[in-house]
C-alpha cells in the first residue's frame, strides 16, 4: 500500500543536520567552525593545546569532513521513526488533481479502478449541481472543509462522464441567490436616470439594464459589509473595486430623484477594458462582457490563493451563479454512432437572426442539430476523420439568461429587422436528456433589455427598458425615464435581453411536482428564497423522487401543448383547467350506448372528450399535470389516481348542470330518407336548441376547418342559408371548393349519367322547353340560396328551409339533391359564360344565324371556352357587377349587385329581357326561337334611362365626360357600335389572332377579339385594330363613313348599330351614295378631317399603347394585315411600320435627317418627357386634358409624310 511520508525539503534536512552536529560545542567557548568540527570529530569539549593542533590538521580536510558529517546526520534523520497516517487511493488522488483541470471526453470503459479501494455510491446533488453532503464535519458558509475526501468526490464524477463535473470548492452557493424583487427586505424604486457625459449612452443603458435585474440588484445590496471593509483598492493600486463601484452607483440611483452621473464606473473604464476610450461610442454588449468579467476578477481577489483555483471553482462566483449556465454539446459520429459529450460554460447566448423572425425561431436554430463539415471531425471511436452532427442542449440553465441578437456584422453594419418576442418564454424543450437538467425550472420572464437606434455599430443611440417592482416597464433614455406599455416593449428593436427565472410559474409547477414526493417520502426539497425547487435535495431518496416526478411532466409538456395559465396541484385540478364550479361551454355529440360507456371512462380524468373530433383519445392524450409517458411508472400513481377520482367525481354533477350544450352533426353514417325521422332524432340529442335559429344568425352547427380535417364525416348535402353572406374569407372559399370536390368524388355515377348536360350547363330536368326553371340560386360563401333553387322534388324547398334551422335535415334526399346541386353549379357557370355578354355586341345578334351558332358553340367548345371577366369593355361597364336574378356565381369577394349602378357616364340599370323584345329576331328566327329561349332568357343588357343619355366611353380617355350625341339625332334611341376596321363583317369571317389561333366559328365577334387583346396594357383601351386606328364615338356617322372612304377604300359598308334598349335596328348605309349626295366640297372637307384624325391617332397611339414584351417583334412591312398566322400581331406590325418607316419631323427618312436631336427626343419620349417633357409632349397632354373636359378637337396643321400622301392619292383614285 503506498504511504505518503511527511518528508522535509532538502534545505530543511541540511539545516537540521548542521544543528544536530554542531549544536553540542556551541557553549564550549570555541565559536569557530573549524574548532566546532574538530570537537565534534574528537568527541572532546576541552580547549587544550592538543585541540588546537587537531584544528590545524582539520583545516586541510575540513571540507570533506563537513560533507561526510552532513550525509551521516541526514541518514540518521531519515532512519528516525516518523509517525504517519495511511491515505487511501494515493495514486488516484494525485491523478484526480490533474483531472480536475480537464474535462473527461471519453469514458474509461475498462475497469481500471477495480484494484483501487474507493466508493462509487451516488450522492444527492443540490440545485447547483454541487455535493451538499459533508464527509468530515459539515460545511461552513456553504463551502466544504479542506478535510473532504477529494478523491472520492472526483471519482464520483469520473465514474459517469455524461454528467456535469462538480467543483472541489464552491465560492458562493447558488441557493443564496435571491430571485425576484419580493425576496429583498427593502423597497425598490423605479430608479433615476443617468446623465450622458459624452457618448456614454451605451454605458448608461447597460448599467440600467443590469440594475433592473432582481438577482444582481439583491446581491449588490447584500455586499454592504464588503463595501465598508474593502481593501482591494490598496492591493490593486488606484483602480479600485468594480463591485463596490457598482453597489454605490445602484444605491445612488435608488436614493436620488434626479439624474445621476455614473462617474464611479466611467472613471474605471480603462480598468474594465483597456482599449475603450473615454468619449467614444462603444458597443453595449462588448462593454457588458468586460464589465461582468471585471466584477468576477474583483470577487476572486478576495481570496489569497485565487490564482491557484481551477476553472470549475472560479465558475462558482456570484456573477457566474447569476448569469452562468452550462451547455451540453453532443457530437455524434455518423459512421459508428459514437457520441462525444462535453460541457461548456456560458454567460450569454448569441442568437443568429438572419433566418429567424421571432425569438422562438432563433432558439430553434441555436439548439437545432447541425452537420459538421464533411470529413472534418476526428472520431474517437473510429480514430479517423468522419462526418458528424453536433447539437446543443441546456444542462444547467442560468438564473438570469442574457440573450444577444446578432445585429452587427464584422464590418459594423446592422441588421435592422424586427424580431418579435414574448415577455415570458419557456425553454424546457431545450433541456438536456438528463435527470438533473429535466428537473430544473425553465420558465423565464423579461426583466430588462438594451435597444439600439441607428444603422451602424459605431453610431446611433442606446436606450434601456427595465421591469420595476410594481410590475410595469420603464424606458431609460439617459436622464429621461418614462413608463412604456407592454405592447411597445414587444415591438422594440431589441439588442440585448435579460430574462430571469419566473418565481410564480416555477413555484406553482414545483409545488405540483413535489406534492407526490412529499406524500410518499417525508422529505422536503431545498428552498430557493421562498421558492421550493425540485432539482435538489439533502437526501438521496428525496432527490431521486423529485427527479422521477418532474422529469416525466417536463417530457410530457414537450410533446403535448403546454397549458397557458395558472395550474392547480394534483387533487384540485378541474377539467381543462377551469375553475371549480365555473360554467363552461362544451360540445355534445350523438352518443350510442358504447360511446356513453366510453365517455364515462374518459370523464374519470376530468375531461369531456369527443369521438376523435376535438381531443385525442384517452389512451394517447396527456393530461395537464402529473401525467407520464407510456412505459414510465409514477412513484405515486395510486395517490394521483385516487386524488383525481375523488376531485372529479365530486364535481361532475355540478359541472354538468352549468354546461351549455351546442349541437353538432354526428360522425355516424346515417342514410335516412325522411326529414321527419331526422328531425325526431335531432330532438332527442339537441336539448338546448329547441327554438329554430333565425336565418340571419350565424350557424353554430357548421363544422370548422380544423374539425373537418379530423372528423370523418360524409357530407350529405351542402349547407344552405336563407340569407346570403355578402363576403367570404379565403378559408371559407377553400372549404367550399373542398366540399364541391368531395361531392364530385362521391357521386361519380350520377355525374357520368348525363355528361353532356352537365358540361353544357343544361338543367337536370329533361323537359326544358315545357317547364322553364324558376329563378336560379346564386352560390355565396359556400351556401346556396333556397328561394328558387332547381329541384325535381315538390318538397325540396321546404327541406332546404329546414336545413337552415336544423343541423341534421341536410341528410334528406341526399342522392337527389347532390345531383341537383351539382347541376345548378355547372348550369350557373355555363349560363355565366354564355349569357352575360356586353350589350354592344357585334352584328351576330341581329342576324338570323347568331343564336343557332351560339348554341352550337356551347356544345362544341365545352372545355375550351374561357371566361374573360377582366376585359376592357366589360370592366368599364359592368366592373364585376351582376344582376340579382342571374345564374352566375358571384365572387365571394364582391357584394351582390344592386338594381341600379351609378357611374361617371350615367345611370346603368340591369334588367331581364326576353326574345319577345327583339322583334327582328322573332321574324327571322321563328324556328330557332324556341330552342334558344333558355339561352336568351337571362341575357344581361344595359338599359338607357330616358333622362340620362348613355354613350360608350372614349377609348382614349375612359373617364371623360359624355358628350351629347347631336349628330345622332337621326338615330333616336340607338347607341352606335364601334366599327371593326370601318366595316361590318359577317359572322363567318375569320379574325387575325394576335398570337393566338383564329376562331372560325360564327360566335367570334369584335368584342371577343377585343377581349383577347385586353392583355395589352392590362385593361387599357385598345386604340388600334388590325394595324389601323379606331374611330371616335363622338363624331357623326357621315364623318365615319368618309373616313372609311379616305382611310380604307371600302366601297360597300354594312354597319350594324345595335341598341341596348328595348328596340334595336339595323342600319345599312352605302358610302358611295352618301358621298355623292353630300357633294365634292363636303367630301373634301371630310377627307381633310379624316387625315388629321388619323395623324392624331398615330401620334397618341405610341404614347398610350403599352407593349409588355409578350409578342415577338417582327420588323417587316410586307406582311399583310389580314394574315391569320398564329404568331402574327397586327398591333406590333403597325408599331414597327410607323417607327421604322415614318418620320414625324420631315419628309426625309430618319437616317437621312441632319438634325439628330428631334429623333433622339422621339426615341426617348418615354424616358424624358414623362418628367417635364418638351413642347410637343405638353401639347399632347393639353389635348388630352381638353378632351377629358368634354371639348372638341383642335385644328392642328401638320405636315404629312410621303407615305401618307401616296396612300391618300391611291385612295382618292379608287
UniProtKB/Swiss-Prot annotation:
Interacts with atms/PAF1, but not with CycT. Residues 666-685, 915-942 have a biased composition (Acidic residues). The keyword Transferase does not apply. It is an enzyme of class 3 (hydrolase). This is Ubiquitin carboxyl-terminal hydrolase 36. Its main location: nucleus. It catalyses: Thiol-dependent hydrolysis of ester, thioester, amide, peptide and isopeptide bonds formed by the C-terminal Gly of ubiquitin (a 76-residue protein attached to proteins as an intracellular targeting signal). The gene is Usp36. The modification Phosphothreonine is found at residues 717, 894, 951. GO terms for biological process: germ-line stem cell population maintenance; heterochromatin formation; negative regulation of antimicrobial peptide production; negative regulation of innate immune response; negative regulation of macroautophagy; negative regulation of peptidoglycan recognition protein signaling pathway; positive regulation of proteasomal protein catabolic process; protein deubiquitination. Residues 124-169, 509-532, 631-819, 836-964, 977-1001, 1048-1161, 1176-1214 are annotated as: Disordered.
